[in-house]
Amino acid sequence: MIDVNNFHYMKIGLASPEKIRSWSFGEVKKPETINYRTLKPEKDGLFCERIFGPTKDWECSCGKYKRVRYKGMVCDRCGVEVTKSKVRRERMGHIELAAPVSHIWYFKGIPSRMGLLLDMSPRALEEVIYFASYVVVDPGPTGLEKKTLLSEAEFRDYYDKYPGQFVAKMGAEGIKDLLEEIDLDEELKLLRDELESATGQRLTRAIKRLEVVESFRNSGNKPSWMILDVLPIIPPEIRPMVQLDGGRFATSDLNDLYRRVINRNNRLKRLLDLGAPGIIVQNEKRMLQEAVDALIDNGRRGRPVTGPGNRPLKSLSHMLKGKQGRFRQNLLGKRVDYSGRSVIAVGPSLKMYQCGLPKEMALELFKPFVMKELVQREIATNIKNAKSKIERMDDEVWDVLEEVIREHPVLLNRAPTLHRLGIQAFEPTLVEGRAIRLHPLVTTAYNADFDGDQMAVHVPLSKEAQAEARMLMLAAQNILNPKDGKPVVTPSQDMVLGNYYLTLERKDAVNTGAIFNNTNEVLKAYANGFVHLHTRIGVHASSFNNPTFTEEQNKKILATSVGKIIFNEIIPDSFAYINEPTQENLERKTPNRYFIDPTTLGEGGLKEYFENEELIEPFNKKFLGNIIAEVFNRFSITDTSMMLDRMKDLGFKFSSKAGITVGVADIVVLPDKQQILDEHEKLVDRITKQFNRGLITEEERYNAVVEIWTDAKDQIQGELMQSLDKTNPIFMMSDSGARGNASNFTQLAGMRGLMAAPSGKIIELPITSSFREGLTVLEYFISTHGARKGLADTALKTADSGYLTRRLVDVAQDVIVREEDCGTDRGLLVSDIKEGTEMIEPFIERIEGRYSKETIRHPETDEVIIRPDELITPEIAKKITDAGIEQMYIRSAFTCNARHGVCEKCYGKNLATGEKVEVGEAVGTIAAQSIGEPGTQLTMRTFHTGGVAGSDITQGLPRIQEIFEARNPKGQAVITEIEGVVEDIKLAKDRQQEIVVKGANETRSYLASGTSRIIVEIGQPVQRGEVLTEGSIEPKNYLSVAGLNATESYLLKEVQKVYRMQGVEIDDKHVEVMVRQMLRKVRIIEAGDTKLLPGSLVDIHNFTDANREAFKHRKRPATAKPVLLGITKASLETESFLSAASFQETTRVLTDAAIKGKRDDLLGLKENVIIGKLIPAGTGMRRYSDVKYEKTAKPVAEVESQTEVTE
């Protein structure tokens, strides 16, 4: 076998008959499979041992030679070679066909490759191949054209006139003769000449034919190989036949299909030997052709061959296709050994990097390691003995197991794995029971909950794999989310509630205003019940030893609460004392107003001071996230994970102490709710009256009513939130960010509000009751629509989002950081992304973590803030925006010159680590996951906008798909193709509007539909590509009008718009990587003197290479225009045929690749996974594996001789 890691590329092509025979170990002559009595394979049949090898290791068929010592012998009785039975997985056979047959892929695919090569229509080909017409191969003196079709009658006429003087044939033989006569060089010349003169349809056909002829010429495939004389038979173990327990047999469909081919082939041979009449032979040949078609691609032509129960049989093509095919089922998604799965339970006592592994599961997973250790410790005498000890679960096994799993990380994975945080490494600890214990803080990353979710465990076996798991995948290392660089391990639910409760302050708490010497005194007082957690107290500031306090402050008393003192103990010492949830307090220092000079206090002491002070807000979920981010910025990952663990412990402890529950009494009904409802009811009556008088349209009435009731709900919600007590448990839950929000509460205590009908339209009758009061039957019925729609939408959305992620990953999987600096001279101009007045993404967020492309100076002081190719840190970004600079050029993936992938400088910092990105990082996959993972949070619906009929703007997930597939958007905007001034806006016929733009040289008029809103005014100057009406721009058209840079920026802005409106933050660089992949190709307009074909899609780098070559030799360069491909199309157009074939349209991709003789250089990730190599990312990159090292240390003996021996 070939060593997987030692080959550099994979090439595919057509197989010649000689090649097929050279693969084969013998000809299969009989359709028999196995003998039903002896269950041995039949000789010369489809499972023959003489051809394919023995069924039992080291044993021939008749049993004369048994044992490994006869290795390689061929038995003289039965002719079977004595070898391993594994060869039955790799040895092929063949069938010598009695008549040539065409290969359905090349004849039936679109476009038909045979048809293009012969310049015949697929229909004509079909008539010939399936014996309906004759084709003229050699016209002789008949005056017929070559390749003319003749019907049976016409052929008879000519044959009577010119007996034996001309040649016309039927079936694949005729086609084969024509293919053998093709002179590729001659065809090429003719086609190149035709390109010069032809136009329209003839030109496109010539280009297509040229492509096929070029492919055959360059690949060394002979056209006649598209016709099969010999049919290969795949190894028997790949199309097995197994006995079921009822004595019946289950067999692969391929065996049935092969049997039909062999039967028909043998019958044809017999008929030919007998010299049967032509018509019978023809019929048999046609049946053979159909049998081979069914074997290669069943159902491609005519009705599929069916098995029992009318089920179409699975042919060779179906074995490769689709989710269950060879590519996706077995090559890209293998099941692995040393893995297990179980239900997860929460493990609150675990450290950040630990997980609990059930004992019996761990024992099974680490079995070989335990066995080795048992033998080494001489607890067991040999491996067999060790194995039985493990199976009996003897007591001594457990101690050894604990030893073995120490420091041996395992990987935990939860499906669906939407982003890279769906697989993380943990150090296992043994737990009782059968559930895997998971650390509560990593649940966010996995999107897991403990209501019965299951997780899979995988054991990294090699030392290298263990090292990678520990260094790169350990849960404590993965604190930041790769999509936006924010912490992903923020506490949730109980932990948030606990910390919120801890930092609450109450006016009426016991002993408010007590003053303590130091924190120990406070804790003692709290333990003895002298103060409560919420008591506001004073503590001598000097006792904190806080480095951020000034000398002045240290002489004063710090006003704080007991809970905050406990909370601050988990914060690192160098931080300011956190007394209020503000960035100022967190990042700089504790506000001075909390330091009180004891001499200034009045009679009532500190208590009096507190009575006049407002309560400080407690710390909610968002602020806890900010604390984590700040700790991460200032300290190592280890410190952060330790602090997280302490924060988790605090949260659980105090949420338990708080004992927060929800009862019916906590849901306070609003007293003046009825009054609000009555007021709005009157407004609705007024609108209805206006409508009845014909003052407003139905549309306006409906929108007004909906608006009135929405306003009613908002008013009730506002008043409810005002009337709530700050210590109300439901309020605390929603305010802290633990669970629920204002809207949930309004539905419980206020009113449910407006509901959507199944169509998505809002029903104008609101539900005025709340859940506390109970709904009427009608209200309940209306609300079921919404509930059902919600569930249906969620299910559809999940599938859609998953498919989007798959397409994104496929198009960007080969984008890897491959070099430090590509040396580009271009940059991307960035500024705020705004929609009207609404800010979508601020300038500061766009530049942080990127490399500058220009020198930025302070406009006033002229000092240099940053030079080109320097990283913009958060501090520098703040300096730039503070200086009033609103736009700048940065390095971007859009302008990166790297041939494959991107370079470090154009990408910027790695968001998952906060450091600069390293060569080998698979940034394409990360980008795809970052865009795809939040897909489930986006809405499905297209919004029905109020007021304007028929202008539905697509939003949410469908809009993202529309952008990445480069489709024509719904609600398309009109753009101007020239620069100039808007001269006139007038009504045109059919209620359309006409916008006239006058340029320097020409005037253009554009038609917009009557309902679309025009956003330009008469006299307004417009640029090329500027929008004239509201809506989305069609990106392909925009590319030709406004150019490459504008299109890139537009697509980036549109994607960000959708995500940010849903409150999802994604870094620009991910979108840039994806959009770059969509714009990798150019379409050749004129070929010049290069070898490129006009009209073909070429990679931008191949295009520039070809032109560079042309300039070098003073020849005419080619011209081309950029093309925007949707992600599906871009994936299929990739250079790698393995990647494309495993994505979609497998047969089409492989057909094309075989004819072109394509070679796959295995640059991407998928290709390498398919053939089983290490992927070329991370440590698998060649630059890391080709490191040579030499020993520089001196030999031990030499060192020892130089050291003095001391006692």
From Swiss-Prot:
Chain residues that bind Zn(2+) 1: C60, C62, C75, C78
Alphabetized UniProt keyword annotations: DNA-directed RNA polymerase, Magnesium, Metal-binding, Nucleotidyltransferase, Transcription, Transferase, Zinc
GO biological process: DNA-templated transcription
EC number(s) given by UniProt: 2.7.7.6
Gene3D superfamilies: 1.10.132.30, 1.10.150.390, 1.10.1790.20, 1.10.40.90, 2.40.40.20, 2.40.50.100, RNA polymerase II, clamp domain, RNA polymerase Rpb1, domain 3
Catalytic activity of the protein: RNA(n) + a ribonucleoside 5'-triphosphate = RNA(n+1) + diphosphate
Annotated positions binding Zn(2+) 2: C822, C896, C903, C906
Short name of one Pfam family: RNA_pol_Rpb1_3
Residues annotated as signal peptide: none
Binding-site list for Mg(2+): D449, D451, D453
NCBIfam families referenced in this protein's UniProt entry, alphabetically: rpoC_TIGR
Record's function text: DNA-dependent RNA polymerase catalyzes the transcription of DNA into RNA using the four ribonucleoside triphosphates as substrates.
The name this protein goes by in its record: DNA-directed RNA polymerase subunit beta'
Organism, as annotated: Staphylococcus aureus (strain MRSA252)
The organism's taxonomic lineage, starting at the top: Bacteria, Bacillati, Bacillota, Bacilli, Bacillales
